[in-house]
Design a protein with these regions (language model features):
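Structural signature of the two symmetry-related core transmembrane helices
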Residues: 2, 105-120, 197-200
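C-terminal membrane-cytosol helix-exit motif in multi-pass small-molecule transporters
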Residues: 2-24, 207-214
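Juxtamembrane intracellular "pre-TM" segments in multi-pass secondary transporters
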Residues: 17-48
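Short amphipathic helix-loop junctions that connect adjacent transmembrane helices
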Residues: 60-76, 80
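Loop-to-transmembrane helix entry/capping segments in MFS-fold secondary transporters
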Residues: 73-74, 158-168
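Residue-level signature of mid-helix packing/kink "hotspots" within the transmembrane helices
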Residues: 84-92, 173-177
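Helix-to-loop junctions at the C-terminal end of transmembrane segments
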Residues: 90-103, 187-188
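Intracellular juxtamembrane helix-capping segments at the cytosolic ends
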Residues: 143-156
Length: 227
């Protein structure tokens, strides 16, 4: 497992260089004031994208579900291999698709994939349906992972993007922690079906929130154009 890490470091040291940047004056160290200067649109996008962490549980729950449907412990990691294989294959065309149908539309599609994955995993009683759910989860990851940071970069002012990224990492980390604790409690108290069913509901709630935000932005754009 350490070999890829060493190869990545070697590639960064020997094969990657920063592009030339114009000289800048002394810059102030980052502070909370930078986050407070973010506008409402940036805060809204950070909140919407961070809340997805409530619906997207840790991959450990996939492993436990695999054991629940009869996957032998020695083959349980195959689910993670499938997840990341689909993730990698799906992520490749996302850039081209985002230029055609828009980034927020792709994010909505990714949440549909996540809801479908949760439904499949909630209903799975055999390995075929389980692996279908894992593949759908991989599609969600492929369609959403790079988009989240891109959407925040688009929403934030250029001079405050670092603050926006840091705030997103903080909020999404806290939300993911809370979501995984809640998922664990649901699993212990009500079983895997309830856990993934709640995940499906949260995914759809996130999708509705983003769809509502898109409609509001479109209405504002039409209003500005008519003035």
């Amino acid at each position: 497992a350490s070999i890829p890490a060493f190869l990545a470091v070697a590639l960064l040291v020997g094969g990657v260089s920063d592009p030339p940047r114009p000289e800048e004056g002394a810059r102030k160290p980052p502070s909370l004031k930078g986050a407070l200067r973010l506008d409402a649109a940036t805060w809204t996008m950070i909140a919407l994208t961070a809340v997805i962490g409530l619906a997207r549980f840790s991959e450990s729950f996939l492993l436990m579900k695999g054991l629940d449907v009869g996957v032998p412990p020695a083959f349980a990691p195959a689910a993670i291999v499938l997840l990341h294989l689909v993730f990698g294959l799906a992520a490749f065309p996302v850039g081209a698709l985002s230029d055609r149908i828009g980034r927020t539309s792709l994010l909505l599609l990714s949440l549909v994939f996540l809801a479908a994955a949760d439904v499949a995993l909630a209903l799975a009683s055999d390995q075929v349906v389980f692996y279908l759910g894992v593949a759908l989860w991989g599609l969600h990851m492929g369609f959403s992972q790079g988009l989240l940071m891109t959407l925040i970069a688009d929403a934030a002012p250029a001079h405050l993007r670092g603050s926006a990224f840091g705030l997103f990492a903080l909020i999404s980390g806290l939300i993911a922690l809370a979501g995984n604790v809640a998922a664990g409690l649901l699993w212990d108290g009500f079983g895997p079906q309830a856990t993934f069913a709640v995940g499906a509901v949260l995914s759809l709630v996130c999708a509705l929130g983003i769809a509502g935000w898109m409609r509001l932005q479109a209405a504002r754009s039409r209003s500005s154009a008519s003035e």
